[in-house]
Amino acid sequence: MQLWLLLAIGLLSADTALERGQEAFRRRDFTTAEKEFLQAIREEPSNARAHKFLGMVYTAEERFQRAEEPFRQACAIDPKEENACYYLGRVYYTLNRYEDSLAAFDKALQNASEKGRTFYGMALTLEAMGRDAEAEQDFKESIRAGEKSALQAYGMFLFRHGRTEESLAALRNAGAKEELERVTNSLGKSPGTKARREPQPLRFESRPLDMIVNNGATGRKYLVETMIAGIAIFDYDNDGWPDIFIANGASLPGLEKTDAGFSNRLFHNNRDGTFEDVTAKAGIAGRGYSMGVAAADYDNDGWVDLFVTGVRSNALYRNRGDGTFEDVTARAGVGGDGSWAVAAAWLDYDNDGWLDLFVVRYLVWDPAHELNCGVQRPGMRGYCHPQHFQPLPNALYHNQRNGTFRDVSIESGIAQYRGKGMGVAIGDYDLDGRMDIFVANDTVPNFLFHNEGSGKFREVGVPAWIAYNGDARALSSMGADFRDYDNDGREDIFVTALSNETFPLFRNLPEGGFIDLSIPSRIAAGSVPWSGWSTGIFDFNNDGLKDIFTANGNVIDNAEMISSRKSRQPNTVFTNRGDGTFRMETLPGAAFHRGAAFGDLDRDGRIDVAVTRLNENPVVLRNITDQSGHWIQLRLVGTKSNRDGIGAWIHIVTESGDQWNRVTTSVGYGSSSDRVVHFGLGNESVIKTISIDWPSGIRQRLENVQADRFLTIEER
């Protein structure tokens, strides 16, 4: 229950419908309370208190959109009804409707007794809007009015904005021991301390691929329809030019690829900006309802293989090296148990030189028992909310080095936790040399699996402050990326979510936990309208600062009929200003975007993007940004480590400073990016040092490396 409701519970005691509702509310019997408050409103429509308590019921159940109307009625009928307008402001804040929130808080100020908490709510709203000076003033007003929680919140506000010493003083005065420890451990490393620079505007040229992503939609609104399609950028024929693979749907409800329009597709890079469909030759059309893809060389033979997730079955395709693939799913033992798998990632979790496989599972679903879910209007059918389905455990397969895998989900500790997984990202958040796993969960807390060594994982999402966003809410988390966006040597995590939720940016703090900086980074305000799916943290303008791409599209195809949000949405890039804030750029072309993968498809030193669109052509977004900076791209070849060098940690030093990046192909939502590691260098034409920490433990160093080149580095 929201903390700001607790003060009301103790005031309740029952004869009328209103009193009976209050008594039920005090017992947390929200079903009865709702019934009684609705009855009270029928008996007396102008009863502001009945409307207010009905809103409190919906808020206690986290049905915030339902709570808006009763709070709005209560505030309109009697602005002086205790907390009515304040509660309305808080609901608007939770729904990220910041202008409406401020208007409601202004009304709440008519009640002198509510000034402290109202100024506190206004401060949070103003910060979310980027009006930091006004936010600080209202924090101070709230503190002066005696709001106890405001001083602690003000301390964290100061920390988010780089004012560490002032933050420490405020947190000491508030007696906030846990927050004080976090800030103390981050001394000298708080965000927002560098000078801002306006990044070079980005330009992309959109080119369609010759296929249609077919979700098999029938009008029945099967949940799988809205969830495809993953995409991979990888070099399948080792010609040095990245190619593209796309996972496609199937007929419904049968979940079979009944014609060629449902086949997965492989496109060969022709090196001239065009791509040739080589699916038939490669033998990789697939079967069933495919969802996502993960690309890597699992058998260390020098050829990149593909793992394709799907509904009821997964598939592993071994690259033969002659332009064809062999389906080795059964022999390898990775077909799954019939569950719905959305995404997957390759990682060497035990550093034995062989890539293991992590599979993200969503929820228990069967087309034969699809629910008929409405969308707030009689007669309309919509995609069912995940709350109607049971969660699933994820799976971990250990590479046996002989072409087979062993399911270690239970013994590793992974299967102990059930979620509704959508995206997966791999990194080493505590720099202990072992790969950790982040899983973006839909409407339930995210997972962070800490690699304990000896084949064991411990789920630490809550203590690491990454299970929920900064408002302690579980979001509809979709895609994720795990990279160091602020060049401090620690990998951060970015997550996409649905519209009105905002996209959290979790900065990795020195003590190993995370802090959600989506508000001070300006990402929160920019992301409110969008439903994000795949994402990637890459330096698109080569200025030495990693930017954030999000593929956007509403989860429902008739959003305009029930809300102000658009169904088809443009993609966005949050360009990094270098001071902890980002500038949002909206790219041309609205669609139901889903998967996105990243790589330099035309080998010009600029990162391109390939994006899938429901029931349309996928597109290649060729990066044609003007006045782009210098760059370098590194292709690692493991000898003692896995052949792809996945997991290697790379540190470069130039006259302008330090940067870090990791070799990984897992990215975004159901997608897989080129394993070649890219660094933008700005004005620097020489790299002073390149240091590589290989998964094997070998440390390798290169000096005085010229920029603007592709460099292959073999482990030695």
Where are the model-predicted features located?
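Beta-propeller blade termini
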Residues: 228-238, 268, 289-304, 318, ...
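Gly/Ser/Thr/Pro-enriched helix-cap/hinge segments flanking short amphipathic alpha-helices
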Residues: 210, 217-218, 522-525, 556, ...
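Register position in tetratricopeptide repeats
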Residues: 26-27, 60-61, 94-95, 128-129, ...
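Repeat-based blade/solenoid architectures
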Residues: 209-230, 282-294, 334-345, 390, ...
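Hydrophobic beta-strand segments that make up the repeating blades of beta-propeller
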Residues: 244-248, 301-310, 357-361, 437-441, ...
